[in-house]
Amino acid sequence: MRSRKSLPRVEQAHLPWHPPGLVAGVDEAGRGPLAGPVVAAAVILDELQPIEGLADSKTLTAARREALFDEIRAKALCCSVAEATVEEIDTLNILQATMLAMRRAVAGLRLKPVRVLVDGNRLPPLDVPAEAIVKGDALVQAISAASILAKVTRDRWCAQLHEAYPHYGFASHKGYGTAEHMAALQAHGACPEHRRSFAPVAAAVQRTVVMQATATIVTTVETTVSVRPAAPRAAEGLHA
């Protein structure tokens, strides 16, 4: 009887397959700063109108980001920018607020994608299939476009905030915890747009409370001393 030789094992190739249709890229800007909203953008690019030079927004100059911002808005099939406010960040925490902003950005798209690609390693809850891609802003053009829209939108917000609170220097540091920003927090305390749930801001708020309480105590003591009645003078003589 002829012996049966074992056949070589054949592994089935698993090729990625995705349903045809529109794909949206999603990214955020502003998770790390001490002030302001976190901004997210969602973009569906038009394959018939390619955009040259799309890349991670952090690797581009401000001028190049501005130029690409306008081109993306003009050529994309649709795009959406959304935010989570400072109050939402302080209530939810920065991670959950970021997921909220991303969810709002996707919901704001005029066209519904069949798939969403998100920069990073976490996904917001969405009603369409989604995939998280680490360093996606450098690998996927739609995510690169979203990173540019989010970054430029937030930088413009910081420029407006600088006009309202020039002593913090928001136009230069964009709300990040630079030495300049930390010194301004030390000197002026927190403004309404600072994130109270972030430790450096919480410390600045606490210092302000202590200083105000100390000033109130000192003022009260000084006022008490100033209105204290004078001691009665000794009689200089008796009168009949």
Curated annotation (Swiss-Prot):
SUPFAM superfamilies, alphabetized: Ribonuclease H-like
Keyword terms, alphabetized: Cytoplasm, Endonuclease, Hydrolase, Manganese, Metal-binding, Nuclease
Sequence ranges assigned to domain RNase H type-2 in this UniProt record: 21-210
Record note on cofactor: Manganese or magnesium. Binds 1 divalent metal ion per monomer in the absence of substrate. May bind a second metal ion after substrate binding.
UniProt: a divalent metal cation binding residues: 27-28, 119
Biological process according to GO: DNA replication, removal of RNA primer; mismatch repair
Top-level division of the source organism's lineage: Bacteria
Requisite cofactors: Mn(2+); Mg(2+)
EC number assigned by the record: 3.1.26.4
Presence of keyword Disulfide bond: no
A GO molecular function held by the record: RNA binding
Secretion signal span: none
GO cellular component assignments: cytoplasm; ribonuclease H2 complex
Name of the protein in its database record: Ribonuclease HII
Organism: Paracidovorax citrulli (strain AAC00-1) (Acidovorax citrulli)
Lineage: Bacteria, Pseudomonadati, Pseudomonadota, Betaproteobacteria, Burkholderiales
